[in-house]
Amino acid sequence: MNVLFFLKPKDEVEFIYNTYSIRQVLEKLDAHGYSAIPMLDQEGHYVSTISEGDILMYIKNNQQLSLKKSENVCIDKVEIRRAINSINITANMEDLLERVMNQNFVPVVDDFNHFIGIITRKDVIKYFYKKNGL
């Protein structure tokens, strides 16, 4: 089975750019009810995944930061505490399953590290659930 079977394409996925402000990211997370979101550079390369926890730690360590001030702080200033690794479009199912066990979603990139979408743990579980008649 090919991992592309599970792919949710980029145009159906929320993501941010590493040039966004902390406030823009917080608002996007809040608007969509996410706790983490893929981050891309301006060329569309996958950079990392930023989480609410990463932002909270940044705020904790920069207590003078207000919501207003967060409009002027770029999200790339926030340290990523837990790497969410991507897989290549040519990855095998074993690679996907290894990652999806530990991540809610797995970013998928092409050979040039361009972000092409995500695979969610929910979709993988749903497939195997239906396949086994549960």
Q: Where are the regions that the model predicts?
A:
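The conserved cystathionine-beta-synthase
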Residues: 15-34, 40-41, 59, 84-103, ...
